[in-house]
Structure formats: C-alpha cells, structure tokens
A protein has these predicted regions:
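Conserved catalytic-core segment of nucleotide-activated headgroup transferases in glycan assembly
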Residues: 10-25, 143-147, 154-223
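Membrane-proximal helix-turn-helix segments that form the acceptor-binding/catalytic region
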Residues: 46-53, 68, 72-76, 88, ...
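Active-site proximal beta-strand in glycosyltransferases
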Residues: 58, 74-91
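Nucleotide-sugar-dependent
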Residues: 171, 215, 219-222, 227-250, ...
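N-terminal pre-catalytic "stem/leader" segment of glycosyltransferase-like enzymes
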Residues: 1-57
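A short, well-ordered alpha-helix in the C-terminal region of glycosyltransferases
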Residues: 288, 295-310, 316-322
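Carbohydrate-associated surface elements
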Residues: 123, 141
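Conserved acidic donor-binding segment of nucleotide-sugar-dependent glycosyltransferases
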Residues: 269-280, 288-294
Length: 331
C-alpha cells in the first residue's frame, strides 16, 4: 500500500498529532508512506496532480480544496481519505456569525468526494453522516511513552496554572484575565504559565511566558500543577477535540475546563478535574486545587488513566491502519 499524506505544516499541532506520529507505526506494518505539505505554487500543483495516480490512497488532513481542484483530485486520485479535527464548516469563535455558506459548501463537497472520512470527535462525525456514511471517529491522541506522569514529589514554592496552545486560541484564556487577577490577590505563591507564541500580561499574578517548542512541550506540561482549558459555547468549540486536556492528563495534571463539547467527555467533573461555567466557578475550582496538592495528584493520576484508556497513539494507530486497509479493499 502506497499512501500520500498531505499536511498543513510540520509544526502544526493537527499535523503532528493526527498524521506524523502515526507514520512509524504505518511503516512498520507495510505502508509505504510519503508526507508532504499541500502544494502552493503552479509548479507544485502540476507535479502534485501528475504524481497522484502512483498512490493507492491520498490522505488529506483538514484542508478543503475548491471545486476545480477537487474535481482534478477526484479524477487523479485512486482513493481519498479526509481527516479533520475542527469545525471547519463554521467560522471560528471570534466571528459574529458562526454560519458560513461558503465554508459549509466547500466542506460538503470535500466530504462527498472522499472515500472515507476520519473525524476527531462525535460532533464532527455527525456533520459528515448526512452526506457520507463512511466515517469513523479517531480522537486526537498522545504517545504514552513520550508523555510520562510528572513527579509530584519535586519540591516547589509556587503553584503553576498552565495553558498550552497557539495564537488562534489564546483569546479564550485572555478572557479570564479578571479571574487571574483575583487569584493572584488571594494566592501570592501562584503563577500563570503560558506556552504559546503570543502572550498577555496580568498585574496581580506573575505570568511566565514560554515560547512553544516541540521538543520541550512535555517538559513544560510536567511543570504545570493545574491545566486550564476555557472555551465558549459555540459551533466552533463543539468541534474542538480536546488536545490540551489530553496533553494535561497525559502528564498527570488535574484540569479545569469549560464543559463544552468533548471537554465533557474528557474531564469527569470531580474525578479528573472540574467543570467551570461562570467566573465564580472558575475562581472557586482553581482555588480548591491550589489549596489541595493531594487532590491535584489524585485527579491527575485518574486523568492519566482515562487517557491511557483510548487517547494514545498505541491505541489509535491500529485503528487508522485498519481504516486504510478497508479503504484499499473496497476498490
């Protein structure tokens, strides 16, 4: 089996966690893999469409082609597998109106043209089913060998609230600015650590700004004491696949999150972390964890057990391989 995997970037989270980390497993099971960035220039596109027939499967991660390119893709590709992990059929949370007919139309066309679709969660799967019944959920996962439980016994004089992500999501965290100020007033030994490529400041709580680096992200996560994942309740957030939470729980952190979409499945309220809907709940739940290190450890260990139950490369890679084999067998 020869498979071409198209990704949006080598450092893009979806590329790393939904494609690149599966390549070694696929290769070890006989799949001849080629990974490439989406073509941009005219020359790259000509070469891309020229090469397509040599592959048994073309695996597209997230990006939707416009109608002319999609027609060419369907003519030249033997089999198409489309993978996505966001509400790409809607506008993001910053938009006044989440509905976009252009996005919806392009998404529908992409789904119709695909032989199989892999969705990152059940909400996304349900967007596919009316158009294409050949769809399964594979959650965004982590490598359980790379993500090890943090050392709870390391002495620390500060409690670290942590958030990891990219510039497109930090606005969710920044909206909690007043909460962080109140937390800082109550707990002088508390800090907020942001691992990202952009940052913001607070006056009453120390903000530790750490530039994200792929080879340091696990160590950064292990330095957190409490993981945060705020969201808003909208169609864009419903499509999120909870990678932050999976990362937090993978290293044994308790999580405080907005109970929206997949967050409700990943965080068991009162067991692996807390749900927080209002500013008062956010402040209260964070405070409870700041004051109770034993509760942090208990919830963190329980969260890791949950992740090991189905959100690892070790459990998801065989499922991806099985899908590729089934797609091969159909044609």
């Amino acid at each position: 089996m020869k498979a071409l995997f198209l990704i949006q970037g080598w450092e893009v989270a979806a590329s790393r966690y939904r494609v690149l980390q599966y390549i070694p497993y696929l290769k070890s099971h006989g799949v001849e893999t080629t990974v490439s960035l989406y073509p941009r220039s005219i020359k790259e596109n000509i070469q891309f469409f020229s090469d397509l027939p040599q592959y048994d499967i073309v695996f597209l991660q997230r990006k939707r082609f416009n109608q002319p390119r999609l027609r060419w893709l369907r003519r030249r590709a033997r089999r198409i597998v489309y993978d996505f992990d966001d509400s790409v059929m809607y506008r993001n949370s910053k938009a006044k109106d989440p509905v976009s007919q252009t996005r919806k139309r392009r998404f529908t066309q992409m789904i119709k043209a695909s032989d199989f679709v892999i969705a990152g969660n059940e909400f996304l799967r349900d967007q596919v089913l009316p158009v294409n019944p050949n769809v399964e959920v594979i959650p965004t996962s982590i490598d359980q060998e790379r993500y090890q439980t943090k050392d709870y016994l390391v002495p620390k004089d500060r409690v670290t609230l942590g958030w990891i992500g990219d510039h497109g999501s930090i606005h969710y965290l920044e909206k909690m600015h007043p909460i962080f100020e109140r937390i800082g007033e109550r707990y002088s030994h508390c800090e907020l650590k942001i691992v990202c490529d952009i940052f913001f400041d607070c006056e009453k709580i120390q903000v530790v700004k750490k530039q994200w680096k792929s080879d340091e992200e696990v160590e950064d996560l292990q330095g957190f004491d409490i993981g945060l994942m705020p969201l808003v309740d909208d169609p864009w957030s419903w499509g999120k696949c909870g990678l932050k939470i999976v990362q937090y729980q993978g290293v044994g952190l308790p999580v405080v999150c907005t109970p929206v979409g997949v967050n409700r499945d990943l965080v068991v309220d009162g067991a692996t972390g807390f749900w927080a809907r209002t500013p008062e709940e956010w402040e209260g739940k964070i405070s409870e964890l700041i004051e109770n290190p034993l509760l942090r450890e208990r919830m963190g260990r329980e969260g890791r057990r949950k992740v090991l139950g189905g959100y690892t490369v070790q459990s998801c890679a065989p499922r991806l391989f099985s899908i590729l084999k089934r797609v091969m067998d159909k044609k």
